Amino acid sequence: MPVRCQQSPVLAGSATLAALGALALYFAEPSGYGKYTESLTPAAIRLPARAAWFLQELPSFVVPAGILAGQPRSLFGPPATVLLGLFCAHYFHRTFVYSLLTRGRPFPVVFLFRGFVFCMGNGLLQGYYLVYCAEYPAEWYTDIRFSLGVFLFILGMGINIHSDYILRQLRKPGEVIYKIPQGGLFTYVSGANFLGEIIEWIGYALATWSLPALAFAFFSLCFLGLRAFHHHRFYVKMFEDYPKSRKALIPFIF
């Protein structure tokens, strides 16, 4: 039996994403993992960072990839399946590459569970909308929104991957000490990796021209932007020689 688009869950899911982003800004507290594990969740049960990131990110790849697997195979299929393929590409990297290379601190299980639920819900929302609800004209591939959006997505993903590489090189295996990131966009901002991912999802929202993607981009801006702000404040307090001209997220501005 074919699946038909139901707008109510799409609207509810999009509203939930936007609300979560707004709540993150309202409370303005750092999430209790990474740099903030010891101060915010000292007694939490934890998993090794690699296992935790793998488990958390996995549903963001598996759920939409499973939806895509049921669609007709073609190199350049309908725009919706190509766009969902970009989403899957990001989370393939996060699940199978980033998680296996990260050298972060042990991860609190409570945040792993929250992240897992979020990733599953968001993966289902984006996949369901694009495959069963989205309608694009045949000329969407030549539309400026698609072209510019895909360009921003690829640019942001490149910035994100390169910035993560710089951060990994700051530590030897087993180290948990902090050093000042140098190079790439870290020359200008403390949250270069977060900026890259925000650019990705803004590009994705533009390319898909969809409410769920816009809501996810808004959530990413709020959540990752706030995390960049807290990282910047952390670095400024920890290092007396931290570059004075470096901003938190947006070069020369914020």
Swiss-Prot record:
The chain crosses the membrane at residues 8-28, 72-92, 146-166, 206-226. Keywords: Differentiation, Endoplasmic reticulum, Lipid metabolism, Membrane, Microsome, NADP, Oxidoreductase, Sexual differentiation, Transmembrane, Transmembrane helix. Its main location: membrane. Pfam families: Steroid_dh. It comes from the Eukaryota. GO terms for molecular function: 3-oxo-5-alpha-steroid 4-dehydrogenase (NADP+) activity; testosterone dehydrogenase [NAD(P)+] activity. InterPro entries: 3-oxo-5-alpha-steroid_4-DH, 3-oxo-5_a-steroid_4-DH_C, SRD5A/TECR. Its EC number is 1.3.1.22. GO terms for biological process: androgen biosynthetic process; cell differentiation; male genitalia development; male gonad development; testosterone biosynthetic process. One of its GO terms (cellular component) is endoplasmic reticulum membrane. It catalyses: a 3-oxo-5alpha-steroid + NADP(+) = a 3-oxo-Delta(4)-steroid + NADPH + H(+); 17beta-hydroxy-5alpha-androstan-3-one + NADP(+) = testosterone + NADPH + H(+); 5alpha-pregnane-3,20-dione + NADP(+) = progesterone + NADPH + H(+). It is a multi-pass membrane protein. It is found in: Microsome membrane; Endoplasmic reticulum membrane. Belongs to the steroid 5-alpha reductase family. Converts testosterone (T) into 5-alpha-dihydrotestosterone (DHT) and progesterone or corticosterone into their corresponding 5-alpha-3-oxosteroids. It plays a central role in sexual differentiation and androgen physiology. This is 3-oxo-5-alpha-steroid 4-dehydrogenase 2. The gene is SRD5A2.
